Amino acid sequence: MKIIFVFALLAIVACNASARFDPLSQSYRQYQLQSHLLLQQQVLSPCSEFVRQQYSIVATPFWQPATFQLINNQVMQQQCCQQLRLVAQQSHYQAISIVQAIVQQLQLQQFSGVYFDQTQAQAQTLLTFNLPSICGIYPNYYSAPRSIATVGGVWY
């Protein structure tokens, strides 16, 4: 279903890209929004999949606490980092917003009951917040904002 949506969105973007736009027109703003959503989806998919697969619950008897196994998935990490670096070259703010979107996805899954273990959810959230440094993306301090809104409304 996601693939069909992405292809449909690609078709819309391709059709819109061939036409000339007036910068103030509604269709130009719609084109920008669709392009941003497509870019975000392209990055979100491999990165959220990398985070989701990074920690898996190891099967244990019911009387023992669940343990986690760290999965080394270099291919998914490379795909995630490659996409995140491409976005960061254009805008560090966009890269940060993508990381925040992944964290929000994880939190929604946690609250909807997808995660039964709080430790797994916390480990994945921590990994997500560290994605930029894992991928070697560091902010340009000359152009970074003084404070960045984070999930939960906390300002840093």
Curated annotation (Swiss-Prot):
It comes from the Eukaryota. InterPro entries: Bifun_inhib/LTP/seed_sf (IPR036312), Bifunc_inhib/LTP/seed_store (IPR016140), Glia_glutenin (IPR001954). Belongs to the prolamin family. Residues 77-84 are annotated as: Octapeptide unique to cereal prolamins. Seed storage protein; serves as a source of nitrogen, carbon and sulfur for the young developing seedling. This is 13 kDa prolamin C. Its main location: other. One of its GO terms (molecular function) is nutrient reservoir activity. GO terms for cellular component: aleurone grain; vacuole. Coiled coil: none annotated. Keywords: Seed storage protein, Signal, Storage protein, Vacuole. It is found in: Vacuole, Aleurone grain. The keyword Transcription does not apply. Residues 1-19 form the signal peptide.
